[in-house]
Design a protein with these regions (language model features):
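Short active-site neighborhood of thiol/selenol oxidoreductases, capturing the structured segment around
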Residues: 22-49, 53, 67
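Catalytic metal- and UDP-sugar-binding loop of GT-A-like glycosyltransferases, i.e.
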Residues: 37, 70, 127
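Proline-centered helix-kink/hinge sites
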Residues: 9, 43-44, 51, 97, ...
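N-terminal "domain-start" segment that seeds a small globular fold
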Residues: 1-26, 96
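Loop/turn elements at helix/coil->beta-strand transitions in domains of secreted/extracellular proteins
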Residues: 30-33, 63-66, 93-97, 121-122
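Thiol/disulfide oxidoreductase modules built on the thioredoxin-like
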Residues: 92-94, 101-127
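Structural microenvironment flanking redox-active thiols in thiol-disulfide oxidoreductases
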Residues: 46-92, 103-110
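Residues that form or immediately flank small-molecule/cofactor binding pockets and catalytic motifs
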Residues: 15-18, 30, 72, 103-104
Length: 127
């Protein structure tokens, strides 16, 4: 059967946390995938979307559903470094894999955030 919809763009991630190897949509094909795009300084992300992602992770088996965080920094870049993110993930006990959206050298909006036309955080994507 021919696919009638174009494939979703692959994530462009500069670094992974809580994952032994890089993740990709292609590698997760056949599973339902939930992506929680967030910024660690976003109040709604910290109070709502990340706890929701963790609850979803606990509710479904890993064989049926992949839950992935995507740290999409589009403001306050100097405060949201990978070192700061590592401390944040530890402090808030975020155990799902988290990728850092690749920075765009020509724009403050990171690459994956642009590819999916996200308008801000939090954003939840389902594949």
């Amino acid at each position: 059967m021919k696919d009638i919809y174009p494939a979703s763009p692959e994530w462009r991630v500069s670094r992974w946390f809580n994952s032994e190897a890089p993740l990709s949509l292609g590698a997760l094909r056949g599973k339902v995938v939930m992506v929680s795009a967030f910024q660690m300084l976003c109040p709604g992300c910290v109070s709502e979307s990340l706890p929701q992602a963790l609850r979803v992770r606990e509710a479904f088996s890993e064989g049926d559903l992949a839950v992935v965080g995507l740290h999409t920094v589009f403001e306050h870049h100097e405060a949201m470094t990978p070192t700061s993110l590592a401390a944040f993930l530890h402090e808030y006990r975020i155990t799902i894999p988290v990728g850092v959206d690749e920075a765009n050298p020509c724009d403050p909006i990171p690459v994956t955030m642009q590819a999916y036309a996200m308008r801000g955080t939090p954003t939840t994507l389902l594949f």
